[in-house]
Amino acid sequence: MRRFLIGALTSASALAMGVHSAAAQSTPTTTLDEVVVTGTLIRGVAPTGAVLTTVTNADIVKLGAVDTSQLLGALPQDSAFNNRPQVGSFGAFQTVNAPLLRYLGGGSSGSNSTLLLLDGVRLPGMGVQQTSADMDAITPGALQRVDIVPDGGSATYGADAVGGVVNLITRKSFDGLEVGGHFGGADDYHQWDVHATAGKTFDKGSAWISYDYSHHGLILNGDRDYTHNLNYTTRPFTGANLTCNPGNFTSGFTVYPIANGAPVVGPPNTCDNSQATTFFPAESRHSLLAGFDYDLASWLTFDLRGYYMHRDATNDGGPNFYSGIPASSSLAGAALNGTAAGIFTDPEFAHMYGDTTTKTWGVIPRLKAQLGHDWQLDAFLNVAEGDARSQSQTAGGNAPVLAADAANGTFNPLTGAFASTAAGQAAKAIQANYYGFSSGKDQIVNTRAVFDGPLFSLPGGAVRAAFGGEFMHEEFTQRNGNAELGDFDSIVPHSVTRKVASGFGELSVPIFGENNRIAGIDSLTFSAAGRYDHYSDFGGTFDPKFALNWNPVSWWTVRGNWGKSFQAPSLASTAGAIPPGVVAFPAGIFGANPAFPNTAGKTVLLLFPGGGVDLQPQKAKTWEVGTDITPPAIAGLKAHLTYYKIDFTNRIATPAFYLSSFYTLYPSSYIMNTPSAPLTTAQIQQYIGAAYNAAQVAQYVNNPSSVYALENGLSQNLASTTTSGLDFSVDYQHPTDFGSIFAGVAGTYILTYDTQATPTSVIQGLDANSVAHLRLSTTVGAQIGELYAKATWNRSGGYKIPATAGNAFQSNVAPFNVINLAFVYTPKATSGALAGATFSLNIDNVFDADPPYFNGSNGGQSGFAGFTLGRFAQLGVTKKF
């Protein structure tokens, strides 16, 4: 990897050395010499057969967005809609805010089904067990706009563009100075940010730099009255935790509450430890983005973008607990023999505090050459890195050492306290400094060259084409384990690499156009694209796409497309990054294979935990058809409607080996030891050969008859998702004497959302997946002279809950309705303190609505479905010089 990085940086330096300074010249503040179009590689044409949604720089100001991820949260097609993305929560391996269109999720692949780009270039992955790019690595103030295409795009961009493509478009140039910031707060919460952009344009180019610092505080679950971790199977609801203070003592299957330092007969001590845990982590972030453009010659342009982000998140994991620690008979009583669980009572490490640090940087030098006859070469080099690190006090402490402490009397598991002796205090210090540590570093070197231009002319217009090639080298390195503070280097790193070589082409054919239009066909354009990607770890995949735009009249478009896309398995989820282990446990403990019910004296060998072996790409077929209208009879009105369907197969998932139906649901995830096909030593050795601890089960390898089955609990290509729905929007703007009034509605209605854990498992629909049919955003507002005012109603629809033991007292989740207000005041003054100033006020969740009640755990949330900070007010000011 080092050779690739050195070579890449050397190339970038060589390009930069060819740039010469020129005399400064006054130019407009922002110019766009060439509009970058997302969804196609052909200049001058919009993506055929698809809807392109754009969030402009002005929209960013109106939203009061501090994070780029907040921009997507305003779109009903994104999973963050009517929600707020959050990262760095305690113990989480998900350390980024990744875009997620069509609610497809990343599954267990460690990558994302929505592709994130910066000026059409991939961002590095960032995470510990995933390599999704982070939207918030790029500050909103540095963006010209954000393009969103909620449609399969692998034929153009390659991997991960299944649910769609999000392209962050940076400023082309900037002249002057802009400074600003925001300050806002909610109950028990505050946040603020400051930003500055400075730049200069000159006769042959421009240079600019944008910096942003933001900070927000921490919210505990106890700061919000709707979040709890309760046992919802009984009434009244009680705390779901048994690790309490005082705790509990378990002997066999009987739980004894601990009272006055001893176990007694009675109902267990229960508690809700979530109230002292993080609901929203504290975070501080530095972001930097710089741009440089220079015309090397009349036909050759050099472009350079560089970015850096550093983010620190702080979390409180709540009370630290011990579990499964044996209690000596002198402590527990001679009649009892068992284990104790409770909360440490020593304040030095009574809580599990954690920190997550993420850093990312990238350098993108680019050359654009005009080759004549309207042909262009666009070539870039992309060198980037994402680094995530997380450390936290380990839940349960150093269990083997703690068990020894309990046995020798330095730790009392019935009270959670260490002895006051020197030995007891030394034992406490060891536990207080015992941390879990995990890190992931994703490094990419990526280069691409695209030729595009006209081939020939038809009566309908010029047939244009684009073709080219791309190469990427990626390396991922992970550390994951427990160690004392200052000794994290003792955790062995694991690295894995891949190379990707790609070739692609695209064609746009205007069959009817301005010169040959006829009645009923004002224009008709067909496009075709295809891309072949060859991965060094799993081979090749080809993804085509065909699209059509038909305009019966100039203001009415009918469009459609069909294509294939894929999501590559993340390097972070492979066995190379996470070496698998093997576990031996008694057969029948989770249930037996109905065909072979005799489990007596047998043992199951399970590959778990660890990364997947021989993972293949997750593949999708996508198609959509829609229509757009801008009727001249109703000036200011525009509307669109799209039907889409996605068949997403071969999805990466982890088999549920703990289910009694495992042998029925996952027939490809085990090998039975049967009289007709007995396992051999060689088979067992081959099956568990990749496990780092294979030597620990040698007794079963040498005695195959004792093995009931070989089971694979690692990530595999098993699952599928089929979803369909309607996207719609209607917008109207009407000029008035005082400015204008406007109103709009946008939403998505999910018709189907069917998942299967395996090809043979039961199909789970919308309700079983906790997916609402409707997500809707309605706006109304006005431009009154210098004042812009808008009210937004965001609605996430309710859904039914399948009857289970965990939610026996609830049959449906109610809708979630939130009202937001936005005001922007832009004085027209051309001189004085108000010249170039903009003031904003945002009030989110005006009526302080809580998310709807939910009787159980929903995606890690207990007692509620959704997320809100509560009523949140924020003031902002920006000044241009």
Question: Across the structure, where does each feature detected by a protein language model lie?
Answer:
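Short loop/turn motifs that connect adjacent beta-strands in outer-membrane beta-barrel proteins
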Residues: 27-29, 173-176, 203-204, 297-300, ...
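N-terminal periplasmic "start-of-domain" segments of outer-membrane beta-barrel proteins
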Residues: 33-69, 93
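N-terminal periplasmic accessory domains that precede
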Residues: 68-71, 97-102, 117, 134-136, ...
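Extracytoplasmic beta-strand/coil segments of soluble accessory domains associated
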Residues: 73-121
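Surface-exposed, low-complexity loop segments enriched in small/polar and acidic residues
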Residues: 109, 116, 219, 223, ...
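Short acidic/polar hinge/loop motifs at secondary-structure boundaries
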Residues: 121-150
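C-terminal beta-signal and adjacent terminal beta-strands/loops
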Residues: 397, 647-649, 751, 794-802, ...
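C-terminal beta-barrel architecture of Gram-negative outer-membrane proteins
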Residues: 581, 743-831
